[in-house]
Design a protein with these regions (language model features):
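Asp-based phosphoryl-transfer active-site loop
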Residues: 67-81, 273
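A metal-dependent, Asp-based hydrolase signature
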Residues: 83, 88-167, 171
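Short, solvent-exposed loop/turn and secondary-structure capping segments
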Residues: 80-83, 88-91, 200-201, 275
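Short regulatory "switch" loops immediately downstream of catalytic or recognition motifs
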Residues: 1-2, 52-55, 276
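N-terminal carbohydrate-binding/catalytic regions of secreted carbohydrate-active enzymes
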Residues: 49-54, 58-68, 81-82
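Bacterial N-terminal signal peptides
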Residues: 12-26
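Bacterial N-terminal signal peptides that target proteins for export
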Residues: 2-15
Length: 343
């Protein structure tokens, strides 16, 4: 009797179980990998590119070993206004550097920084900022530098959002990074920022290991401590300026393959996108336009937006994007939410 009662149940399970197994993948496929993006041309372009380069029957199929995507950092992956995060770090290190080198106290631009005049600091020239960076990012071992940056990031907060800088990553771009990796792409940060600085937190914040960070790089010197242990000291010598034409040069030097997709947000990314999209088969170039003063900042001067020295997006760059088929991402229209903590 027991066996007879069980047979109908077993028969039912034999029918239902295959249906369940069939529907589970279907539900998974229907999950939106880019939920923080509004439906629109930018989101569709990402899906189309990934589909064309990863489906084996596609004429534009790219083997996994060749799948490279590069991402600028400042203004593309996280907030860059009102001042680049690394520059803020360097400015806050000036008093300590001057303490060790008192002769810098009355010398510009260190004198201006010590005075704490924000308006005057904002007007510092690129040459003056480079002098500050050279003084504050050298003269210590690589290990000491990494420890210093970690310590600073643990307490430093953005003046507007009152949150750690590492929390101010753009959720839509974090989703793109994960989506690309889920489809066999190796993701790289290619930044004008300091390579050693970004490598400290890139794996934790972006899921990108330090060896996949290409940035502006300074020299190091090999030596030994008093116990004979070898170490590297950071020196004020520029090896690679990873801005403008330096980006494709850095990509060739450090990666060795032309990317199939590149993301940026400013004139400093133009050559990287040119280099990427000049290749054969499907290519994707995307630029983030900061046009959302309510949730973040609005700056260009493309499309009549306010001009800026930080993350400049000119009308000429906008015109080139349209000419070359690059997709301009409107922060205001294309991103449903900006940060992971947004409701």
């Amino acid at each position: 009797m027991t066996m007879l009662k069980l047979r109908p149940r077993l028969s039912t399970l034999s029918v239902v179980l295959p249906l369940l197994l069939w529907t589970v993948p279907t539900f998974a496929q229907q999950t939106d990998p880019l939920p923080s993006w509004n439906d629109g041309a930018a989101k569709k372009a990402i899906f189309k590119f990934v589909r064309e380069t990863t489906e084996k029957d596609s004429p534009k199929f790219v083997p996994v070993r060749q799948r490279i995507a590069t991402f600028d950092q400042d203004g593309t992956l996280w907030v860059e206004h009102p001042m680049y995060t690394q520059v803020v770090y360097c400015l806050e290190r000036v008093p300590r550097v001057v303490k060790d080198k008192p002769e810098l106290k009355d010398k510009e631009p260190f004198k201006t920084v010590l005075a704490g005049d924000r308006e005057a600091i904002a007007k510092l020239s690129l040459k003056e900022l480079e002098e500050i960076l050279a003084a504050t990012l050298s003269g210590m071992s690589v290990d000491e530098f990494q420890a210093e940056v970690n310590k600073w990031l643990a307490t430093a907060k953005h003046p507007r959002y009152k949150r750690p800088y590492t929390e101010l990553t753009y959720q839509p771009m974090i989703e793109v990074l994960k989506y690309f990796r889920a489809n066999g792409y190796k993701t790289y940060v290619v930044t004008g920022g300091g390579q050693d600085f970004v490598r400290v937190y890139s794996e934790k914040v972006y899921g990108i290991p330090p060896e996949q960070v290409v940035g502006t790089a300074g020299g190091t010197k090999y030596g030994y401590d008093k116990d004979g242990k070898p170490f590297l000291t950071k020196e004020p010598k520029l090896l690679l300026n990873d801005n403008n034409a330096g980006k494709p040069e850095g990509i060739h030097l450090m990666i060795g393959r032309r990317p199939f997709a590149s993301f940026g947000n400013s004139t400093g990314d133009r050559q990287m996108l040119e280099y990427t999209t000049a290749g054969e088969r499907a290519r994707l170039g995307m630029l983030v336009l900061h046009d959302d003063s309510k949730r973040e900042y609005a700056y260009g001067p493309a499309k009549g937006l306010p001009d800026t020295k930080v993350g400049t997006f000119t009308e000429a760059l906008y015109d080139e994007a349209k000419k070359r088929g690059w997709v301009v991402i409107s922060m205001k229209d294309d991103w449903k939410r900006l940060f992971s903590f947004d409701k």
